[in-house]
Structure formats: structure tokens, C-alpha cells
């Protein structure tokens, strides 16, 4: 296991609870004589911190590990910037759900100490890369750890499009949109739209139509190395949008093509040794607990 000396900290802005947790984390790391580097945006609202700062884009180059304090959305944003550097990422949950941010604030010192002592698991999560092309030229590009979503934007009208997988025509469709999700994203927007839960170790992509105009239209799970192409109908009278993790947005025009494929770099996500994916699902999704008197 790697032993970490240079620790980066990213914190969600706009929350006093996050700031309090960042201060505790900073104090704990410094007491262990580690080199702490703050992302510049959180550093601006921590006057007198006396630490090295870095942009999020460069943080992965100067750190052995980055700790994200916030919710799953905070970690999604960090993942897109850090995956290219192959730097491990650990999440401390200050959000509402916490599928990706494992550690509770009240156990910060104990659990982070275990990680620093080499007691942790590393899970590789792949990202998607999306590109919007118009008349053969790229007009927008983005990465996503959860999902790439084609949606109507501010319009209430349906989108008409064609779907191709690895160059093979699959179908044309009228729907409110289309969700292309990783296993990580299968418990997010795709789940709300009726998609399946996929274990994070699966090398697969799920394609989930949003309110399709055909009862036979169902989610499709394809190989993780597939290349998807979505062609917006030339007869459309609206300009739909493509969103990556709900954070980066591109506007499409009729006739545009969206390609989605696996990104080469992966996110290295750190978990405590006792991390249990099914326990996370059971807790976060409200599944039934063990029956009384059941076996171990």
C-alpha cells in the first residue's frame, strides 16, 4: 500500500459545516507532520491558513492523495479533474447521500488515520468522455464519472434521435432524453429513470431512455468499451442539451452528433477496509435489514 505524505484538500463552498470539517482535517494532518495543500477556492475563505495552495487542475500533480470534504457532487467535480493524474481520492461526507464519500465527519480522525497507516482499499472507477460534433467539427467536450445525459433543457418537448452502438444502428426514439451511465452512476439519475443497479466492478455502460414514447423501450446494458453515437434529428425545432454529471452543459442543434465512450484514465477511489457496497446500497436506498432470527 502507498503511504501518503502530500495531502490535498478540496471542500465544498457555501457550507459552514464543510469549513469546520476542513479545519479539523487540516489540524489533524499537520499534527501527523504531513504536507497539506489546499485547493485555492477553499483556501480563500480560510484566512491565515499558512499552507501551500493549488488550483484543482494542478492539485493532482503535487499530491499523493486528495481528500474531498462535501457530498457526492463535490467528489464528482473533483474526480473529473484528478483522474488524469492517477491520484487516489478519499471522501468525507458532508452531503445528503454519500454513495462516494464514505467517511462520516464524527469518525474523521480515526478513519483517516487508518488510511494514512496503509489500511485501505482502492477501487478503480471509470469515467465517460462525451463529444458534441456539428458538421464534423467538435463544439463541446466533457467527462463524467456518473452520467452523460441528453435532455430538452428548458423546453418541455420531446427529443427525437437515433442511437448507434459500435457503428451499428440500434433504434430511433422519441423521448424526454437519454441517460448514458457508468456503474458508479447507475445509483444516481439512471436509477430514478428505471435503470438497473450495476456493481462498480462491472465493465459496462447502461443506456436508459427518459420517458420514451414507446412502451417497449427499455434500458440496455452494453460492454464498457462500446462507443455510443447519438444523432439528434435534423427535423427538431428545439435545441437540446448534453450534461456531464449535471455540472458541465453543452447545447446541441438539430443534426448534431454526440459520441460517448470510456475515458482512458480512471478515478482511484479510496475506501476504508470494512467498506461494503451492499451495505451502502442498503443504507442509502432504504433496503430491508436482516430478518429477525436470520443467520449470519
UniProtKB/Swiss-Prot annotation:
Pfam families: NAD_kinase (PF01513), NAD_kinase_C (PF20143). Disulfide bonds: none annotated. The active site is at residue 72. It comes from the Bacteria. It is found in: Cytoplasm. Transmembrane segments: none annotated. One of its GO terms (biological process) is NAD metabolic process. GO terms for molecular function: ATP binding; metal ion binding; NAD binding; NAD+ kinase activity. Its EC number is 2.7.1.23. InterPro entries: ATP-NAD_kinase_N, ATP-NAD_kinase_PpnK-typ_C, NAD/diacylglycerol_kinase_sf, NADK. It is an enzyme of class 2 (transferase). One of its GO terms (cellular component) is cytoplasm. HAMAP family: NAD_kinase. This is NAD kinase. It comes from Pseudomonas fluorescens (strain SBW25).
Amino acid at each position: 500500500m502507498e503511504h501518503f505524505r502530500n495531502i490535498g484538500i478540496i471542500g465544498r463552498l457555501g457550507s459552514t459545516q464543510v469549513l469546520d470539517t476542513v479545519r479539523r482535517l487540516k489540524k489533524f494532518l499537520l499534527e501527523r507532520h504531513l504536507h497539506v495543500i489546499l485547493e485555492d477556492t477553499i483556501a480563500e475563505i480560510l484566512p491565515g491558513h499558512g499552507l501551500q495552495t493549488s488550483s484543482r487542475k494542478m492539485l493532482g500533480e503535487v499530491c499523493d492523495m486528495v481528500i474531498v470534504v462535501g457530498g457526492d457532487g463535490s467528489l464528482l467535480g473533483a474526480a473529473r479533474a484528478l483522474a488524469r493524474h492517477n491520484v487516489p481520492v478519499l471522501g468525507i461526507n458532508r452531503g445528503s447521500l454519500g454513495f462516494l464519500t464514505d467517511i462520516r465527519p464524527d469518525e474523521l480522525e480515526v478513519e483517516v488515520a487508518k488510511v494514512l497507516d496503509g489500511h485501505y482499499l482502492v477501487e478503480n472507477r471509470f469515467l465517460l468522455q462525451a463529444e458534441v460534433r456539428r458538421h464534423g467539427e467538435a463544439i463541446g467536450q466533457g467527462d463524467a464519472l456518473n452520467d452523460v445525459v441528453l435532455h430538452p433543457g428548458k423546453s418541455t418537448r420531446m427529443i427525437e434521435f437515433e442511437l448507434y452502438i459500435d457503428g451499428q444502428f440500434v433504434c430511433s426514439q422519441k423521448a424526454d432524453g437519454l441517460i448514458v451511465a457508468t456503474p458508479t452512476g447507475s445509483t444516481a439519475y439512471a436509477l430514478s429513470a428505471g435503470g438497473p443497479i450495476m456493481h462498480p466492478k462491472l465493465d459496462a455502460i447502461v443506456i436508459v431512455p427518459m420517458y420514451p414514447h414507446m412502451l417497449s423501450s427499455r434500458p440496455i446494458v452494453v460492454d464498457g468499451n462500446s462507443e455510443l453515437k447519438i444523432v439528434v434529428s435534423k427535423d427538431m425545432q428545439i435545441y437540446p442539451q448534453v450534461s456531464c454529471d449535471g455540472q458541465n452543459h453543452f447545447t446541441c442543434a438539430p443534426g448534431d452528433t454526440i459520441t460517448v465512450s470510456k475515458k482512458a484514465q480512471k478515478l482511484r477511489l479510496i475506501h476504508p477496509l470494512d467498506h461494503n457496497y451492499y451495505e451502502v446500497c442498503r443504507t442509502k436506498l432504504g433496503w430491508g435489514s436482516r430478518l429477525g432470527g436470520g443467520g449470519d
